[in-house]
C-alpha cells in the first residue's frame, strides 16, 4: 500500500534547503516564522552571533483575540515594532518552508507596514 507523505517532513526538508542559502547578520538579521496548528511565532535572529534580537508570538497577551490570520497580523506588527525599537530596519525573510500564503503572508505584510524592509 502507498504511504501518505508527511507534510511536516517535506516542509522541514524544504526549510533546510533554503536555510543553506540564507542567513542573518547583525546588519541584516533573519526574520524567522514558525507556524503551528494553534499559533504563529516570529523571531528576528542574528545567525552570526546566534542571538534572538526580537520576537513575538500568539502567546503574547496583546494577541489573544481574533482568528488565526488576524493574530498573525498582530504578531507581524509586534515583531516589527520591537525590531525597529532596537534599530533594525532591514531583515531577510525566512518563511520556514511554508508557502507564502495565508497566515505567513499576513504576518509579512504587517511587518512591512510597520517598518521592516524585506
Swiss-Prot record:
One of its GO terms (cellular component) is cytosolic large ribosomal subunit. Keywords: Ribonucleoprotein, Ribosomal protein, RNA-binding, rRNA-binding. SUPFAM superfamilies: Translational machinery components. One of its GO terms (biological process) is translation. Residues 10-20 have a biased composition (Basic residues). GO terms for molecular function: 5S rRNA binding; structural constituent of ribosome. This is one of the proteins that bind and probably mediate the attachment of the 5S RNA into the large ribosomal subunit, where it forms part of the central protuberance. This is Large ribosomal subunit protein uL18. The gene is rplR.
Amino acid at each position: 500500500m502507498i504511504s501518505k507523505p508527511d507534510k511536516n517532513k517535506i516542509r522541514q526538508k524544504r526549510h533546510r534547503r533554503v536555510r543553506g542559502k540564507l542567513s542573518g547578520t547583525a546588519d541584516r538579521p533573519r526574520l524567522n516564522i514558525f507556524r503551528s496548528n494553534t499559533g504563529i511565532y516570529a523571531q528576528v535572529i542574528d545567525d552570526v552571533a546566534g542571538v534572538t534580537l526580537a520576537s513575538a508570538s500568539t502567546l503574547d497577551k496583546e494577541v489573544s483575540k481574533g482568528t488565526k490570520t488576524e493574530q498573525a497580523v498582530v504578531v507581524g506588527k509586534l515583531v516589527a515594532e520591537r525590531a525597529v525599537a532596537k534599530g533594525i530596519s532591514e531583515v531577510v525573510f525566512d518563511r520556514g518552508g511554508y508557502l507564502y500564503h495565508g497566515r505567513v503572508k499576513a504576518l509579512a505584510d504587517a511587518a512591512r507596514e510597520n517598518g521592516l524592509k524585506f
